[in-house]
Amino acid sequence: MSTAVDEFATPRPIAGWRIVLTAFCMAVFAWGLGFYALSVYAQYLAQAGHFSPALLSAATTWFFLVGAGALYAVDAAVARIGRRAAVFAGVLLLAGGAAALPQLRSPVALFAIYGLMAFGWAATAGTAITQIVGAWFVARRGLALNLALTGASFAGFVVVPSMVAAIARFGLGTGIAMVAALLAAGLGALLALNLREPQAMVAAGEAGAAPAAPAGPLRTDARLVAMAALFGIGWLAQVAFLAQQLPLLVPKVGAAAATAAVAATTAASLLGRLVLASIVDRLDHRRVTAASFALQAVGMGLMLAGDGPLPVIVGSALFGASVGNLITLPALFAQREFAPQHYAAVITRVWSVGQVLYAFGPLAAGLLLTASGSATLPLLVCLACQLLAAALALWRPGGKAL
């Protein structure tokens, strides 16, 4: 294991920061076309009469479930054809699938294309970015990952508005295809120029560079089970709230205040990433994770207790401050609590479990909202999940709490 002075896993630091830039653009691409744009696809495909809203919601859940299983296929592809080729294939699948969606009329074709897009998402999103950046950085891995994954937040500001504007100007099919093609071309150029394995790190046997060790020996590891549980439960609540934020808050404070709360969540997510990025490598990863989930619970508590717009907006900002950081922190668990050769396998396992759970988050929140008729029950359940995740973060398998 490298010491704190070994900032990089390679003697060429500038190459490491080029990887961070490339990973940032991967995050913009993946979250832009494979996460935030899902709501755009659902809205405009339903509006055009191509598919029903219920069918599109089911296809979205299918997308995330297939994506969870696809993570293992992507790991196998990386071992066989290399990381760059696997990412290029993912770019083609995700961008090509998005461009094809407006041409579809058959439900079978819709689910088939969403399934192919899920493989593209798996090859370009969180697990891939974490493994790529982790192969180049050691002591400052938290900083590098936070900067790279800031692209996920940036995608929410840039890709969706650009896609909506393109659809309004050029029509549904041309608008989506244009945005997808531009994103794919830009990312493809960066991948061709920058993405490669750090050979010096492979020779040294550092964390993240070696091929992923088989996940089999980890299956009964209590640390991995607890880690997957805490992030899976926390992400489930997080995605449930974010997907239903407007339906939950509009009846409580009105459309204008609810929209302001969504904007506060997004802005706080970006700010929270930048603040934590500069200090996360010096902090205890378990305490940071527990504090992040607890902060989200406090934000939900404010939304529950407050009657006017201010508590809802402030609560949404507190919730949002941890949104981005909670997809970075699993990498620090993997680096600090597991052997270097297991880094990639641990990341894949945690993301696959988490994605299976959070795939059902929007549906669960919607059902609770419909059944109860108010935002109180969904918010209480999400708050309880975040507190449970915080408690799990403070517990080390073997009975030792922090």
Task: Cite the ranges covered by each PLM segment.
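Helix-to-loop junctions at the C-terminal end of transmembrane segments
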Residues: 70-82, 273-284, 369
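C-terminal transmembrane helical hairpin of 12-TM major facilitator-type secondary transporters
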Residues: 265-269, 275, 280-333
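Extracytoplasmic gate region of multi-pass secondary transporters
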Residues: 38-42, 222-278
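C-terminal ends and interior cores of transmembrane alpha-helices
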Residues: 92-105, 295-307
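Hydrophobic core of transmembrane alpha-helices in multi-pass small-molecule transporters
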Residues: 28, 109-124, 232, 311-324
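Helix-loop-helix hairpin linking two adjacent transmembrane segments in secondary transporters
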Residues: 152-198
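Intracellular juxtamembrane helix-capping segments at the cytosolic ends
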Residues: 123-137, 325-338
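Extracytoplasmic
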Residues: 18-53, 160, 239-246
